[in-house]
């Protein structure tokens, strides 16, 4: 599939399936804890400065945000999880919204699960990966903020993440930096393969 990634726009925000776009376009969901760099990932992948707004306040994305890419596919930005300052009730509501989308959306082709290369995956990261494996949803692990770690230590951090996730070697694992754009081509290759 040839994609003009510059031709991208935010299409709509949805709280439940009655608001989802009604068509056949394939979707790739982006999941990760608050402040893992999801907005930066979207902006880097689409060569845009601020199509997805990066927020200094984690937990800002409270809806599913659908991004139209060249009228051929969509990114779906899922609310960041694991942010402590949101009430338990609010977190449960997000959880249900995310689960409904991931388990019932026929357009969904894969989930890009973002983790921070600098840290061990959180319990939420592990739970998300296990959830995707359980429901047999194809998953691409993208380890963000690679520029914050010396290249010589990438392997060590990658191994630690894979061990904690109990990573399935048949899944894609991509080291990514929105600063240097490292991993951008690999991420697109992995995504397009899933469409």
Curated annotation (Swiss-Prot):
Domain spans labelled EngB-type G: 24-195
Co-factor requirement: Mg(2+)
InterPro entries associated with the record: G_ENGB_dom (IPR030393), GTP-bd (IPR006073), GTP-bd_ribosome_bio_YsxC (IPR019987), P-loop_NTPase (IPR027417)
Residues at which Mg(2+) binds: 39, 61
CDD domains linked: YihA_EngB
Signal sequence coordinates: none
GO molecular function, one term: metal ion binding
Gene Ontology cellular component list: cytosol
Record's keyword annotation contains Cell cycle: yes
Keyword hit for Secreted: no
Swiss-Prot/TrEMBL keywords: Cell cycle, Cell division, GTP-binding, Magnesium, Metal-binding, Nucleotide-binding, Septation
Function field: Necessary for normal cell division and for the maintenance of normal septation.
Family classification: Belongs to the TRAFAC class TrmE-Era-EngA-EngB-Septin-like GTPase superfamily. EngB GTPase family.
Protein name (database record): Probable GTP-binding protein EngB
Organism of provenance: Streptococcus pneumoniae (strain ATCC 700669 / Spain 23F-1)
């Amino acid at each position: 599939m040839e994609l003009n990634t510059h031709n991208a726009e935010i299409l709509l925000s949805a709280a439940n399936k009655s608001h989802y776009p009604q068509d056949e376009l394939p979707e790739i969901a982006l999941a990760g804890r608050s402040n893992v760099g999801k907005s930066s990932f979207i902006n880097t992948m689409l060569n845009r400065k601020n199509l997805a707004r990066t927020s200094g306040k984690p937990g800002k994305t409270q809806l599913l945000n659908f991004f139209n890419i060249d009228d051929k596919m969509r990114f779906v930005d899922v609310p960041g999880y694991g942010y402590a300052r949101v009430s338990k009730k609010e977190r449960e509501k997000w959880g249900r919204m995310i689960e409904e989308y991931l388990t019932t959306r026929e357009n969904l082709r894969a989930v890009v699960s973002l983790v921070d290369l600098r840290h061990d995956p959180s319990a939420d990261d592990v739970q998300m990966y296990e959830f995707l494996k359980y429901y047999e949803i194809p998953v691409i692990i993208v380890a963000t903020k690679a520029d914050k770690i010396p290249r010589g230590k990438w392997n060590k951090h990658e191994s630690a993440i894979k061990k904690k996730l109990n990573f399935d070697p048949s899944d894609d694992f991509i080291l990514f930096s929105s600063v240097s754009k490292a991993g951008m081509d690999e991420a697109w290759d992995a995504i397009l393969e899933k469409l």
